[in-house]
């Protein structure tokens, strides 16, 4: 039997998720379009093997169950909606530009809070401050992470820890508008749809998840990373009007070679055959579109929201890079103060009105 014939139907996967959350409600049907497009692409384009079928079903089940559970928590505790996400910082840019290393460095600052793997993959029940580092889900997620070929390959090229910073794919996946799937499978029609669709509903659920995660664990500033955020900058700013961005940079040719290698080593275990030409074309297209969208967004009056960091600088002087970002943020705060005519000291510097602009 062909592996694709073993794939459960959408109705079967929906029923499976609902059986795990009795009385659950998906909170609308906006997610269905993305899942329909994904399923059609998988059946007609992906050429996945049995491992790929299991990995796909597991991802779909996780996203549906998380959506059901989050919606249930909001229904039982409507006060969660009153949570405020204060000045989140999104790491954006091309794939393979150092966002993972950067996220681990930024996560050391107690003022920051990263989206952590175990919280992204199993957000319910929402974590509490007193158990952020000893929640039993940490050990459970740690066992699951190496089970797929993708996770194993990533561990060789990227540090992945259950209690370490995660990409936002798990939150956006609840709307099935996530680059997660094009990183797993060769599905050009889903990719084209994702390029053209409205991503704001996905960030609505992204925000719902963050509010839930900080409801019992108050947060000063979220540090969020995912190269696919670069494709959705207007949607992010619509959802988070006070957002700021760290843009990471690298020679595009090296970035493309690196991501093709990563995808092949990881997701290649999910395919019946490997189409290297497709990988090269597809990721060149993705990187080109990421750059075009970021340039257009910055040129549209949003350049002041960005802090730029080149991969070479991050590798050569990681702490210096972080200090430069921290000082930049401090300078912006100081400028806001001196605009009122007030003078304050920051370290060895005195900021005076009009001297430093954000």
Kindly give the residue locations of the regions a language model identified.
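Membrane-proximal basic amphipathic "stem/tether" segments
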Residues: 1-4, 11-12, 348-358
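Conserved acidic-Pro-Pro-aromatic motif
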Residues: 323, 327-357
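Post-Walker A helix-loop "phosphate-sensing" segment adjacent to the P-loop in P-loop NTPases
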Residues: 108-118
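PAPS-dependent sulfation machinery
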Residues: 121-222
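Short, glycine/charge-rich beta-strand/loop segments that flank catalytic centers
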Residues: 74-96, 119-125
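Long, basic/Gly/Ser/Thr-rich N-terminal segments
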Residues: 1-78
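Glycine-rich phosphate-binding P-loop
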Residues: 90-110
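PAPS-dependent sulfotransferase catalytic domain
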Residues: 71, 75-77, 82-83, 196-221, ...
């Amino acid at each position: 039997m062909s592996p694709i014939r073993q794939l459960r139907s959408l109705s079967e996967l929906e029923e499976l998720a609902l059986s795990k959350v009795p009385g659950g409600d998906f909170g609308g049907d906006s997610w269905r379009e993305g899942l329909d497009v994904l399923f059609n692409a998988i059946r007609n384009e992906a050429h996945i093997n049995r491992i790929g079928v299991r990995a796909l079903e597991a991802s779909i089940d996780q996203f549906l169950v998380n959506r059901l559970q989050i919606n249930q928590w909001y229904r039982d505790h409507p006060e969660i909606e009153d949570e405020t996400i204060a000045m989140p910082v999104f790491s954006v840019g091309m794939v393979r530009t150092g966002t993972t290393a950067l996220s681990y460095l930024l996560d050391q600052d107690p003022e920051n809070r990263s989206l952590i793997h175990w919280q992204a993959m199993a957000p319910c029940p929402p974590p509490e401050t007193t158990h952020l580092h000893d929640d039993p889900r940490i050990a459970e997620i740690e066992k699951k992470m190496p089970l797929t070929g993708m996770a194993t390959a990533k561990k060789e090229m990227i540090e992945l820890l259950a209690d370490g910073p995660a990409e936002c794919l798990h939150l956006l996946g609840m709307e099935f508008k996530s680059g997660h799937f094009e990183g797993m499978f060769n599905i050009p029609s889903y990719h084209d749809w994702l390029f053209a669709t409205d991503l704001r509903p996905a960030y609505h659920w992204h925000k719902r998840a963050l509010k839930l995660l900080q409801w019992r664990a108050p947060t000063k500033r979220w540090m969020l990373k995912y190269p696919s955020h670069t494709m959705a900058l207007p949607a992010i700013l619509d959802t988070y009007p006070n957002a700021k961005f760290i843009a990471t940079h690298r020679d595009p040719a090296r970035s493309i070679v690196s991501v093709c290698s990563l995808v092949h080593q990881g997701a290649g275990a999910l395919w019946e055959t490997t189409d290297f030409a497709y990988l090269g074309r597809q990721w060149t297209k993705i990187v080109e579109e990421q750059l075009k969208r970021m340039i257009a967004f910055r040129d549209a009056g949003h350049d002041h929201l960005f802090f730029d960091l080149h991969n070479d600088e991050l590798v050569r002087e990681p702490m210096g890079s972080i200090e430069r970002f921290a000082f930049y943020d401090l300078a912006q705060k100081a400028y806001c103060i001196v605009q009122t005519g007030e003078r304050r000291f920051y370290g060895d510097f005195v900021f005076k009105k009009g001297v430093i602009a954000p």
